[in-house]
């Protein structure tokens, strides 16, 4: 199937609009630029990282259906690419159904993955995939009842994990070890949710050995059919639900790897179905899984590049961002690994506007390393402001070098 791309800022332009313009969106935009695509970066605040590199920058409340509709109808992009969850997804479905725009991977996928309830019910109840035991709760009292089993269903018990139904980067997530933690966890979830839903998911704790992200790509083959391919598994470490380092490849037993791929294929095949039921959805998905021995449990999925996948900037022939850009444009993809590597997060360390970074030269002196400083206009002590990536002959060396490089970067108030 021949693919034609135009010239930016001309009548022939191929136009892509990103809804959400953080550090991951910024890398997608750069990948699209390299393919000659005209880009529009949308976010809720001015000077978001992706807006700094796009042809056009727009600032709206993306959860407002009227604002979202007006912008898409005015700009008329060929593709709309959601990069965050807090979007008026029913409006995207309406616009897609009307033929106004094509949503990546589909408007249905954007709706189902906008919060943890939609995707968990799809995975566990519709597809029958293995997950942790879970319940959705609308109050601290319901949360306590779900943990104790006094709601007429099997007890979730302690330890358990509570998360807002909509949040990002671990915000509002906590582990509960006993009854004294319940009210604190509820309050923390309410403060950390991206949109005020007043609803949480409580999950029974799985005694896993490690967790992975399996980047899964749905892309057009030469005959026009959509084929699924997988990157090598990415291991990662989280603190309070927030990724702090990742590495690739994560060694896995063959049976566990096959089960992980089967789960990822099942959920992405379903999310790839459009409103008409056709398997038309294209793009990259980040599928999060828990692993213990040969056992694998589904955790979450994002229909877009994943923060732990920043490591692919150092490891793959095509990073997750290049894979996403190619897949959504109908171009061939290559998920092969080039070399082992790792990533380590650089936190802001200070609450300030327009921070400066010292130690960049020292960081880049570490062998095989590179940096991404995201350009976020405002820093917080625990806000992710950059990442160090490292390539090496083995994962352990790459992890050590990525941590060393990240530690040498010193953000400060300018």
Swiss-Prot record:
Mg(2+) binds at residues 288, 300. One of its GO terms (molecular function) is ATP binding. One of its GO terms (biological process) is 'de novo' IMP biosynthetic process. InterPro entries: ATP-grasp, ATP-grasp_carboxylate-amine, ATP_grasp_subdomain_1, PreATP-grasp_dom_sf, PurT, PurT/PurK_preATP-grasp, PurT_C, Rudment_hybrid_motif. ATP binds at residues 116, 163, 168-173, 203-206, 211. Pathway: Purine metabolism; IMP biosynthesis via de novo pathway; N(2)-formyl-N(1)-(5-phospho-D-ribosyl)glycinamide from N(1)-(5-phospho-D-ribosyl)glycinamide (formate route): step 1/1. It is an enzyme of class 6 (ligase). Residues 121-329 form the ATP-grasp domain. N(1)-(5-phospho-beta-D-ribosyl)glycinamide binds at residues 23-24, 83, 307, 376, 383-384. Its EC number is 6.3.1.21. One of its GO terms (cellular component) is cytosol. It catalyses: N(1)-(5-phospho-beta-D-ribosyl)glycinamide + formate + ATP = N(2)-formyl-N(1)-(5-phospho-beta-D-ribosyl)glycinamide + ADP + phosphate + H(+). Keywords: ATP-binding, Ligase, Magnesium, Metal-binding, Nucleotide-binding, Purine biosynthesis. Pfam families: ATP-grasp (PF02222), PurT_C (PF21244), RS_preATP-grasp-like (PF22660). Involved in the de novo purine biosynthesis. Catalyzes the transfer of formate to 5-phospho-ribosyl-glycinamide (GAR), producing 5-phospho-ribosyl-N-formylglycinamide (FGAR). Formate is provided by PurU via hydrolysis of 10-formyl-tetrahydrofolate. Belongs to the PurK/PurT family. NCBIfam families: PRK09288.1 (NF006766), purT (TIGR01142). Homodimer. This is Formate-dependent phosphoribosylglycinamide formyltransferase. It comes from Paracidovorax citrulli (strain AAC00-1) (Acidovorax citrulli).
């Amino acid at each position: 199937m021949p693919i034609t791309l135009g010239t930016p800022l001309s009548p022939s332009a191929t136009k892509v609009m990103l809804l959400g313009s953080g550090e991951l969106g910024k890398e997608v935009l750069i990948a699209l630029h390299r393919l000659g695509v005209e880009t529009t970066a949308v976010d809720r605040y001015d000077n978001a990282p992706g807006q700094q590199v796009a042809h056009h920058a727009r600032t709206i409340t993306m959860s407002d259906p009227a604002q979202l509709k007006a912008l898409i109808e005015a700009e008329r992009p060929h593709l709309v690419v959601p990069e965050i969850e807090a979007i008026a997804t029913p409006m995207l479905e309406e616009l897609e159904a009307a033929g106004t725009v094509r949503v990546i991977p589909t408007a249905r996928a954007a709706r189902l993955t906008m919060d943890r309830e939609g995707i968990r019910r799809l995975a566990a109840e519709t597809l029958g995939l293995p997950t942790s035991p879970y319940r959705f709760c609308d109050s601290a009292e319901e949360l306590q009842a779900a943990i104790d089993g006094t709601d007429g269903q099997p007890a979730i018990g302690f330890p358990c994990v509570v998360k807002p139904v909509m949040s990002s980067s671990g915000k509002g997530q906590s582990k509960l070890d006993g009854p004294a933690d319940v009210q604190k966890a509820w309050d923390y979830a309410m403060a950390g949710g991206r949109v005020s839903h007043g609803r949480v998911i409580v999950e029974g704790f799985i005694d896993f050995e490690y967790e992975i992200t399996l980047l899964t790509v749905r892309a057009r083959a030469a005959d026009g059919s959509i084929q699924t391919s997988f990157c090598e598994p990415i291991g990662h470490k989280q603190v309070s639900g927030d990724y702090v380092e990742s590495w690739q490849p994560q060694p896995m037993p063959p049976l566990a790897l096959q089960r992980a791929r089967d789960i990822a294929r099942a959920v992405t095949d379903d999310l790839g179905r459009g409103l008409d039921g056709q398997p038309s959805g294209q793009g990259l998905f980040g599928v999060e899984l828990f692993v213990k021995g040969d056992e694998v449990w589904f955790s979450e999925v994002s229909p877009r590049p994943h923060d732990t996948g920043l490591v692919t900037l150092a490891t793959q022939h095509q990073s997750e961002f290049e894979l996403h850009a190619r897949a959504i444009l109908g171009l061939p993809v290559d998920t092969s690994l080039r070399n082992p590597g790792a990533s380590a997060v650089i936190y802001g360390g200070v609450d300030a506007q327009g921070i400066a970074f010292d130690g960049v030269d020292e960081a880049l002196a570490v062998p095989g390393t590179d940096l991404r400083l995201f350009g976020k206009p405002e820093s917080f002590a625990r806000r992710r402001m950059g990442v160090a990536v490292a390539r090496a002959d083995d994962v352990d060396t790459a992890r050590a070098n990525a941590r060393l490089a990240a530690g040498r970067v010193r953000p400060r108030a300018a």
